[in-house]
Design a protein with these regions (language model features):
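Signature for HUH/AEP ssDNA processing cores
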Residues: 1-137, 141-163
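Flexible helix-coil linker/hinge segments at domain or subdomain boundaries
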Residues: 161-181
Length: 181
């Protein structure tokens, strides 16, 4: 079984240092579990008593300091039935993503943040050959009240589309999926 842990950091800088040292098999999720400390994590819908899943049923954005995680994942043409932008990925560099983010959310000027490649990016096999290149970007932004993260994400989504930073794709099942910063 996997384990989940809710951790509190004295500062954003402490979180950044911790994140940089995190092994690749670990991931950060948006929101926190009810209690601090370690908890067993199961697949959504298969939780036993005392277990949680990394789902909205167990993770919440609480009224406390937290981290807004912006996850910009790309879709390959073979993953979708159709891709808006003619298959072009919206941001190929960290600077391009930050420039777009600052246009959408100018309130971020002067704000601390951390940016890096998604864990699905730059993957290599045991022989050292790259099997996947850039697959997405993650941006971490400290907030004073994490309960406002869902509202902030909605504002960012709307502003993204207004600033030309929205895109979409037709999923294999035929539904249209909107994406933005």
């Amino acid at each position: 079984k996997a384990i989940g842990e809710t951790i509190s950091f004295p500062s954003f800088e402490d979180l950044v240092e911790w994140r940089k040292a995190l092994p690749t098999q670990c991931m950060l999720v948006s929101g926190t579990f009810d209690a601090m400390g370690v908890v067993p994590v199961a697949i959504k819908g298969k939780e036993a008593p005392g277990e949680v899943s990394a789902s909205k049923a167990y993770l919440a954005h609480r009224e406390q300091p937290g981290i807004l995680i912006i996850d910009i994942d790309y879709k390959n043409e073979d993953e979708v039935a159709g891709l808006y932008l003619g298959g072009q990925q919206p941001y190929e560099t960290h600077n391009a993503a930050l420039e777009a983010l600052r246009a959408v959310l100018p309130e971020l000027d002067g704000c601390a943040l951390m940016i890096g490649w998604s864990t699905s990016s730059n993957l290599f096999n045991k022989a050292g050959n790259q099997v996947k290149g850039t697959g997405g970007i993650r941006i971490y932004i400290p907030v004073t009240d994490a309960s406002k993260i869902p509202m902030l994400l909605e504002v960012m989504h709307k502003r993204s589309w207004l600033h030309g930073e929205g895109w979409g794709f037709v999923a294999v099942g035929g539904n249209f999926e909107e994406r933005s910063l």
